[in-house]
Amino acid sequence: MTSTKLIEYLIEGYANSEDSSFLIPNSTKDFLAVRPSGNPISAKGLVEMFNSKDLVAESSELVKTHKIEIFGDIAYAVFTLNEIFSYKGNQNKDLSTYTCIFKHENGTWKYS
């Protein structure tokens, strides 16, 4: 299977995950996300946020993968998700565009 296909599967896996169990096994130890607020957060921090009672994920759907570029053991992808979630009881419907970096470690592509 090509690296592009493997990264597409990671994107689809994240989009279709119904809980936070997808992220930790599919991310590097040094994974870092930067939220729209500008605050960085680790994979563990994201899992804790999604497992809190304040945040309730209702649905997530991959709308489009815009681009995947691979440079050796590093890649990036840009994709859009249609997400519905509630935060502290307030429902949000977001069309969110993500830019993600991936690393190829020990024969496996992971979110970085």
Predicted regions, residues:
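A solvent-exposed, acidic/Ser-Thr-rich amphipathic alpha-helical stretch
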Residues: 4-9, 20-70
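Beta-strand residues in well-ordered beta-sheet regions across diverse protein folds
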Residues: 34, 78-80, 112
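Short, cysteine-centered beta-strand-loop-beta hairpins and adjacent loop/turn segments enriched
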Residues: 56, 84-93
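Short, surface-exposed coil-to-beta transition loops
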Residues: 60-63, 78-80, 93-98
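A short hydrophobic beta-strand element
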Residues: 72-83
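Short beta-strand edge/turn micro-motifs at domain boundaries
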Residues: 95-112
